[in-house]
Amino acid sequence: MSHGLPTAARLICVCALGALLLAPAANADLRVGAADDHPKSSPEVAARFYDAMKDVGMTENRITLLWDSAHPTTITGQENLAAAIRAADADGVRVTLDIYPSKAKALTESRVAPGRFAAFAAEVARTFPTVKDFIIGNEPNKSRFWQPQFNANRSRAACSAYEPVLAASYDALKSVDKSITVVGVGLGPRGTDNPLAPGNLSISPVRCIHDIGLTYRRSKRTKPIMDALSYHPYPNASTDKLDAGYAWPNAGIPDLARIKQAVWDAFHGTGQPTFEEAGMPNGPARTLKLRLNEVGWQVSIPPANRSAYFGKESVVTTDEGTQAAVYGNLIPILACDPSVESVLFFNLVDEANLDRWQSGLMRADWTKRPSYSIVKGAIAAGQTRCTGRRVAWRHDYRPVGVHLNFLGGSRRRSDRNKFWSFVAGSEEGTRYTAGLYRARRPGRVAPTLRALIARSLRTVRMRGAVLRSRGKLVGGWDKVIQFPTKRLKPGYYVYGATVVAEMNAARKATYVGRPFAVVRR
C-alpha cells in the first residue's frame, strides 16, 4: 500500500503562533532528536535505531532509567543501558538520561528517599561518564508519576515536594562533574488543579512551576537547581492543529511564553537563572534553556501495518499526513526561539501496544511514516537554524491580557437602576478589586481622581468607593463583575479596578474607566 504524503502535509506553512518576532536571527542550531527506549532492547536494535536516527539527521536521544526505592543503589538493566550508550557514543548521538522513580510514592514515603535518589543519580553519572545530560523526574505534576498530588487539606503537594529532590540531585550530579547539565522537572503540559478530579489528579504546569519556586525561596538556597527546564508540550488532542495551544494555566507549543513567564515569576531575583530576554543584559541570571523532551501527535495505523500492533486504541488520533505537516512546521518555528535548545519526538519508533503511544516517525514494524521524510528534509534544508526573525520574549510586569468593558462615556443610567456591573477578563488567573466612584464631570478622568481611585483600591475598605466588589478572574474566561444592588443619586460616576496576577502579586495594574451619568427619571 502506498503511504504517499497528502497535499495538506506538503503545504507547510510556518506560523508565528502568536510569538513576538522582533530580534535578529538566532545563532545556535536547534537539536532535533527522539525520546525512545528502543536502544535498551538489544545491541542489534540499538544499531538499527541509531542508523535510522543518523539517516533522519537526529542528534539526541533521551533514554529513561527507573529508580527502585527497594534497591536504591541498583542500576536496573545496567548492561543493556551501557550497550545503548556505547552504541550512541559510537554514532555521535547525544544521550540524555531521564531518572525517575518506578513508583509514584517512592520519593514521598520516606524522609531519606530524596537523598538516596540523589546519591543514585550521582552513581549513574559516575557509571556512565560520557553522559552529560540528566533529567531529574518525569511529569511530577501527574499522579501517574508522583503521589500525592494534593495534601489532605486539598492544597497542592507534588511540585513543592519535588523541589528538594531536584536541588539534592543538582548538588550530587555537580559533585561528580560540574560540566553535567542538570535538567529539571520533565513537566507535563496540562493539569486539572482539582483535588477532587475523578481519575485525573494533576497540577497545571504554571502552578507547578510556581510551587517549585515558592519552595525554593523558602529554602533560602542561593545556588541553582537546574541548568535547563524539560517540558512536554503535547497537544490536548492529537487532532489539534499546531497553533491550537491551551488556556492558562496549561501550555502547549504556542504557549511557551506562558512557561517562561511562570519561571520568571517563580525565580526572578534568586540564584536560579530564568530565560533569556530581548533587549536585556542576558548575563548569568538569564541562562536557563528550554528542552522540549517529549513532543508527539498520535496517529491511526494503516491496515497494511496493523499486524505489528496489539490491543485497542484509547484516544482520538490524527492521520499520518497531518502529523507530518505538524512535525515539519514545528522545527523552523522552534529554531527561532533562542530559549529552546532541543525538541525530541516521542518516539522515533511506535510502541506496539495501541493503548500506549503511536506518535513516531516510524511504525512498530519500522516502516517509515510521511513524517520521517518531512523531518529529514527539514533538517537537511537547514531549518534547525533560524533564517527569519527570532522570538523576542520579555517578561510581563502587569497581568497578561487584561480587558475591562467599563460602562462610560455618553451612556446614561436612570437613578431608579439598582444593578451595576461590568465585564472583565484576563489571559491568566488574576484577583481583582473593583469600585464605583463619584466623579465631578464627564470626559477624561483627572489625574488627581485617578490617583485617589488607585490608592483606594489598594486598601481593604476602599475608602471613597460608592460600591465595592472583589473576586477572581479565571484565565481565558470573561466574567460579569457585579456590585451590591443600590440606587445611586444623580451625578457622574466612574468604575475603577486593580487586577493582580495570581502567580505574582507584584504584577498588578489599575484601570479607570470614563465617567457616566446617572440621571433622574
Task: Write out the residue ranges for each language-model feature.
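Bacterial N-terminal signal peptides
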Residues: 11-23
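Boundary/entry segment of secreted carbohydrate-active catalytic domains
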Residues: 28-60, 64-66
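Noncatalytic carbohydrate-binding groove/subsite architecture in carbohydrate-active enzymes
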Residues: 43-46, 113-118, 157-317
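Aromatic-rich peripheral "rim/lid" segments of glycoside hydrolase catalytic domains that contact
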Residues: 44, 72, 140, 144-145, ...
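Substrate-binding cleft and catalytic face of glycoside hydrolase catalytic domains
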Residues: 53-199, 236, 348-351
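Structural beta-strand segments of beta-rich domains
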Residues: 416-422
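Glycine-centered tight-turn motifs at strand-turn-strand junctions
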Residues: 442-491
